[in-house]
Amino acid sequence: MKAVQISRFGGPEVLEIVGLPTPRPARGQILVRVHAAGVNYFEVLMRSDRYAITPALPMRPGVEVSGIVEAAGEGVASGMLGTRVALPTFAFGISSGGYAEYVAVDADSVLPLPDTLSFADAVALQVQGLTALHLSRLRSVTDKTVVVTAAAGGVGSLLVQLLKAAQARKVVALTSSQAKQELALSLGADYTVSYADSNWAATVHKALRAADLIVDLVGGALTRSCLPALAPGGEIVFAALGRFDLSSEEVDGMLANNQALSGFALLPRLAPSTVKAELLELFHQATSGRLKVVLGGGFSLERVGEAHRAIESRETVGKVVLYPHGDG
């Protein structure tokens, strides 16, 4: 089978296609033909050794896939053969291997896909869907003004919708282009501003007063630009692992204004006993029309470098997906 491997850190060119034996499912395992594999920004950072944790090399990226069960090992019910499934491998301790034509996993780590949910949408609702779901429930947002950075991205586009459903008074979408602002509005954002406007925080103040909560999915210098938009007593939830850039003086200033700064990481919040129920909830919201999945581009396995370049240049919206068998 074909798979993507990283043997050295660097640009998208270090993503190489390698030939590997197709896995044989062991006892209790299934072999899944991968129809869609998710591409995430943290994988872009890992590839270039800019992530909070340096992965061991060689590595095969990919932590979320969807596909069809093609073979089963001993002890697995034969009824699983041919079923459409989602594999949130990251939630079950498997941190690599999804950028491939096939994966072998424990049968109890997958969940069935509704017939009306596409493979690509199922992938979009895994890492990014769960992140958005947990962020939307981290604090009560009822009657509050919430700013979401990168609001047209894979997490942001879902979070905007979930915050509105959770009765946020106003959801402000911070994006990088006019097209992305229009997308955020179509998803339910009440107000949009652009990173390109250096006075965006003042614009938010003038239109809506200050924000009670800011969910920062970007980090770096953008976190600093969020401070003037935050109300006294407000909170920034920092969900951009490895990209924290506030100085101690700026944090002291927040404390003086009774403002809070909270970190957010998805994996410590996930439990194998509940993650399937959470994903099934997201799948139901998507198939019932209450949650719109935004797809930002599909690429063959051979074009994985282009997928990483598109994400890195912030050209994309929503979820970027690989189609290892050209099913997209």
What are these regions (language model features)?
Residues 221-290, 324-328:
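Glycine-rich phosphate-binding loop and adjacent beta-alpha segment
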Residues 199-209:
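Short amphipathic alpha-helix with an adjacent loop that forms part of the alpha/beta core around
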Residues 93-107:
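A structural motif shared across PLP-dependent enzymes of the aminotransferase-like
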Residues 86, 212-215:
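N-terminal Rossmann-like NAD(P) cofactor-binding module of classical short-chain dehydrogenase/reductase
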Residues 290-297, 305-328:
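C-terminal capping/lid region of NAD(P)-dependent oxidoreductase domains
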Residues 80, 122-197:
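Mid-domain Rossmann-like dinucleotide-binding core that forms the NAD(H)/NADP(H) cofactor-binding site
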Residues 98-99, 175-183, 246-251:
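Short, glycine/polar-rich helix-capping loops at beta-to-alpha or helix-loop-helix junctions
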Residues 21-39, 50-91:
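Glycine-rich beta-strand-centered segment in the early N-terminal region that forms part
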